[in-house]
Amino acid sequence: MPTGYTLAALCCVALSLARAQLPTLPDAPITTFGVTVVDPFGLRGDIYLLRPETNRLPKFEKLKPVGAIYTSALNIPPRDFSDGFPGVTDRFEWFAIDYNGYFYVSNPGIYRFLLASDDGSMLYIDDKRVIDNDGIHPIQAVEGRITLSGGIHRIRISYFQGPKVFLALILAVARPGENFRIFSTNEFRPPRNPADWKYGDPTNLPTNDPAVKRKK
């Protein structure tokens, strides 16, 4: 650490530089990583504990989650983190979260996504990698785009935090012809009547769900 600077001063500089990388987004509530209360319309995040010195996202299929959390949006700006996950684990470094969920597109077209994180993250839609922001790094934002048909689509955001103390995780979306805003599953809910649902991909929803009847 350079001499002559306090930790607080260095932290302020780091946060200022990090925020400068992010586009101006409309006001949105700051969220936590999630809560243990189940949200059937939100993102489910499975939490995994990592070995120290992990420098990339793990292969989740080889790990066992220690618990799950739920959230409708990921809007965690650069900050220090020591809270852990109440009700799941007190780990605040060397952990990963694998978020999975669905969202409904009413207006088909080219959608732009922005994923900012400290440390690594990736975005998949319908099992296609849209953004690769992996690795150990201070906050950085990466943009990706994908053409989406109308209907239900699968979304996955994988994230990991390496060494303490700072972290961040922000997912934003720009609908066709619009500016970026925080992605929220609450704004992409399907019609109330499942009979009216359409599917961008015939594998987007579990086939063992008796409430789902596919519309051709």
Protein language model features and the residues they cover:
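N-terminal secretory signal peptides that target proteins for export/translocation
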Residues: M1-P2
